[in-house]
């Protein structure tokens, strides 16, 4: 049999690229017939992923990365609707991706056969480009099966209403999600001006030859049962958790001295005594909210490690959060002195290293799917503080459907006027450290997630099925 080549086209963004590369790495380790070429679209936001991707490519002889030339960015006023800006930026890159794919295909030797293209789910607008090469398109979901079910359901819901949802609308009945979904926890993109761009993405999901999901069947059984009952759904391959357990992304953003300081501090804390607050690469707060978080932590009486990043100053063209240069300016008077025996505040944090540390006992999170999987993997219960994208839906399901998290907020949205008060924060932090029932359940599901990716586990079997289907779909027709 010829060598088989898969082309990956991740969406531009740290979480999307890292997940795609980690999935690619797992494919290469599983089957030596396969090689992978990644067509990488540059992120519109500043990133320090270069050293991470270079190291990963250098460690895998059958993995190569080709940079797609930067296209013109959408007008900056669209950045007020992040999903709209993100989707338009991807669509602007379609001609450049077509050219890169053309050049790559024409350069291939006869001994290597391109068997398919794995597109990030946000890159569905490129399916027609892949079709031009008579190649099958597979979608890679960096999120979960419940969210995939929502994407399948969204066009049907729109056909009934024809407009963005309102808070007063009835709950949505999504086939792959057990409880009815309140409109206030639907993805932010449905109400921030991105609705029709988002609808355009969701309406093309069924055109894919198959969909790879970063989850496992045991975590989302109901969603996978709903896919099996729907004859119009493409095959869905749960292959997760797909995680960067070496925290290579974080280390590319963090010097060794900073990391050592954090880990050394954790080493001095009792087991499961520290609550970790971290809100992802784009999570940030105003100074007013920072003060309330500080007071809430103090009221809780718990030890804490807080990754503190601020909203960019007004008038800034950047959407990227900034580290705080002077903590005393933004924290309540005397806070640092009063909590110096109990807390540590940092900028960027090595999240996986922290979650895997024996001292960590709770996680206040923005509920990005990668962060949820990392926390479950390491058996750390979560307090929900969603901010953007589909995080409100993730938080809702984590608390109401899975019973694996504790609610602080399910519908908080970044950029709003709401300030969560110290009392609410303090109670939530204390509850996650004291709730033994949720902690036990999270530790149990962590074991399940680990077994899923071991030889013979559900995700390992599903990965093998994906490989065989891809190869059979291509070589079986020759």
Swiss-Prot record:
PROSITE patterns: UDPGT. An anthocyanidin binds at residues 16, 389. The keyword Transferase applies. Its EC number is 2.4.1.-, 2.4.1.358. It catalyses: a 2-acylphloroglucinol + UDP-alpha-D-glucose = a 2-acylphloroglucinol 1-O-beta-D-glucoside + UDP; quercetin + UDP-alpha-D-glucose = quercetin 3-O-beta-D-glucoside + UDP + H(+); pelargonidin + UDP-alpha-D-glucose = pelargonidin 3-O-beta-D-glucoside + UDP. It comes from the Eukaryota. Pfam families: UDPGT (PF00201). Keywords: Fruit ripening, Glycosyltransferase, Transferase. InterPro entries: UDP-glycosyltransf_plant, UDP_glucos_trans, UDP_glycos_trans_CS. The keyword Thylakoid does not apply. Disruption phenotype: Loss of fruit pigmentation, and substantial decrease of the levels of various acylphloroglucinol glucosides and an anthocyanin. One of its GO terms (molecular function) is UDP-glucosyltransferase activity. One of its GO terms (biological process) is fruit ripening. The active site is at residues 16, 120. UDP-alpha-D-glucose binds at residues 142, 349, 351, 366, 369-371, 374, 390-391. Belongs to the UDP-glycosyltransferase family. Glycosyltransferase that catalyzes the glucosylation of diverse hydroxycoumarins, naphthols, flavonoids, acylphloroglucinols, and pelargonidin. Involved in fruit ripening by synthesizing acylphloroglucinol glucosides and anthocyanin. This is UDP-glycosyltransferase 71K3.
């Amino acid at each position: 049999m010829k060598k088989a080549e898969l082309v990956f086209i991740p969406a531009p963004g740290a979480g999307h690229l890292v997940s795609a590369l980690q999935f690619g790495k797992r494919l290469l380790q599983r089957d030596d017939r396969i090689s992978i070429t990644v067509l990488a679209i540059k992120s519109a936001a500043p990133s320090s992923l270069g050293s991470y991707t270079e190291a990963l490519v250098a460690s895998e002889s059958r993995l190569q990365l080709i940079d797609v030339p930067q296209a013109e960015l959408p007008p900056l006023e669209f950045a007020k609707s992040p999903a709209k800006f993100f989707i338009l930026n991807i669509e602007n890159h379609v001609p450049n991706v077509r050219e890169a794919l053309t050049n790559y295909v024409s350069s291939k030797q006869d001994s290597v056969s391109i068997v398919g293209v794995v597109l990030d789910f946000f890159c569905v607008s490129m399916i027609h480009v892949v079709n031009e090469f008579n190649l099958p398109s597979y979608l890679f979901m960096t999120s979960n099966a419940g969210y995939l079910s929502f994407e399948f359901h969204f066009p049907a819901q729109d056909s009934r209403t024809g407009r963005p949802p309102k808070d007063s609308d009835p709950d949505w009945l999504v086939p792959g999600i057990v409880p009815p979904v309140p409109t206030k926890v639907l993805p932010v993109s449905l109400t921030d001006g991105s609705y029709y761009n988002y609808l355009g993405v969701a309406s093309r999901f069924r055109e894919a030859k198959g969909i790879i999901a970063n989850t496992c069947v045991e975590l989302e059984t109901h969603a996978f049962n709903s896919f099996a009952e729907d004859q119009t759904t493409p095959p869905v391959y749960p292959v997760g958790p797909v995680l960067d357990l070496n925290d290579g992304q974080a280390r590319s953003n963090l010097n060794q001295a900073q990391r050592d300081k954090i880990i050394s501090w954790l080493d001095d804390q009792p087991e499961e005594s520290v609550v970790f607050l971290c809100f992802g690469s784009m999570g940030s707060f105003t100074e007013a909210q920072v003060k309330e978080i500080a007071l809430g932590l103090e009221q809780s009486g718990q030890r804490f490690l807080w990754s503190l990043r601020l909203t960019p100053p007004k008038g800034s063209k950047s959407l990227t959060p900034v580290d705080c240069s002077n903590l005393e300016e933004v924290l309540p008077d005397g806070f640092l002195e009063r909590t110096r025996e109990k807390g540590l505040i940092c900028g960027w944090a090595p999240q996986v290293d922290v979650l895997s540390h024996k001292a960590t006992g709770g996680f206040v999170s923005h509920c990005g799917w990668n962060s949820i999987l990392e926390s479950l993997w390491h058996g750390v219960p979560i307090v929900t503080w969603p901010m953007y994208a589909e995080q409100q839906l993730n938080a809702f399901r984590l608390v109401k459907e899975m019973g694996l998290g504790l609610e602080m907020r399910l519908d908080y949205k970044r950029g709003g006027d709401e300030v969560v008060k110290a009392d609410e924060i303090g109670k939530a932090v204390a509850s996650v450290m004291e709730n033994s029932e949720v902690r036990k359940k999270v530790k149990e599901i962590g074991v399940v997630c680990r077994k899923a990716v071991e030889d013979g586990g559900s995700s390992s079997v599903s990965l093998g099925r994906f490989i065989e289907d891809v190869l059979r779909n291509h070589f079986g027709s020759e």
